[in-house]
Amino acid sequence: MATSGSYDFSTSRDTIIKDALLYLGAIGEGETPAADAVTEAARMLNMLMKSWAGDGMPIWSLKRGYILPFTEASSISTSSHVVTNYDSTTISADEASSQTTLSVTDSTDMAASDQIGIEMDDGTMHYTTISSVPDGTSVIVATAIDDEASSGNLVYWYTASADRIQRPIRVFDMQLKNETAVTSNPINQVGRQEYFDLSDKTSEGSTNQVYYDPELGNGTFHVFPRFQNGDTVIEFSFHRPFQDFDAAGDEPDCPQEFYLALTVGLAAILGPKYGVSLKERQQLLIESKMYKTEALDSIYPEGSVFLQPDNARRED
């Protein structure tokens, strides 16, 4: 038996729209939907995809994020130093206040315009941008440091355009990681009332409680106690939002198993516009739900799979 050896089947925004309209009988074989019809269907397709976030959509939308140390504040927006990737190094020689050229252990992967955070001797974090990287062991920053920075103090950097997080839909599995010792301790994720009931939210120490507010635009993390220096980073797992269908050739932000559910679901939503009867539309909704359930069943749930031997006695 000959098979293709190929696994890269995909579809696109406009192909899904055309297939949905064909499924409805709104267009015939070989016909092209009108531009206005495509625009309206694309809008509904985006709404449908966004609504799927209610299922949590595990696995492919599950990512790891990091809150870099920030000081003198109890909360941080996801538009700030909350990232999916970062690098760290240390100051390699004592630096005086007002310096812009800093000696670091390794600046190899730094680049101009990257965000950089330097731990000051008073425990605060000084965030600015990188102006240039003269060599592999120094960096020039845009805003001079406002305190002394001793050798061994931590330095964090990341590329804002690539590494800043998209607003998480859900956040869970939080740990406080010591950047130097590379050890982690669990953080208790609390609700809104539990966090705001805390008496002294300006106290500093090892963060052990976090409340995440997924407000519109950018989410906000509230931490307790506040970071006391730059030694630790908060790690967490999160479900990111689904990507939009912006252009005709945009592919779905989901595995292949969900393509059919997406197409039939769009057909069900568009049904009334094209004169589909209530009974037929109900059938489309049933089909769409069935295909989506089957697709979800094919995706492993979050968590671990444990394998163990069968120790039952076997007769030869």
Give the label of every model feature segment.
Residues Q99-T105:
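Short alpha-helix capping/helix-loop boundary micro-motifs
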Residues M1-A96, T108-D316:
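Glycine-enriched, solvent-exposed interface loops adjoining structured elements
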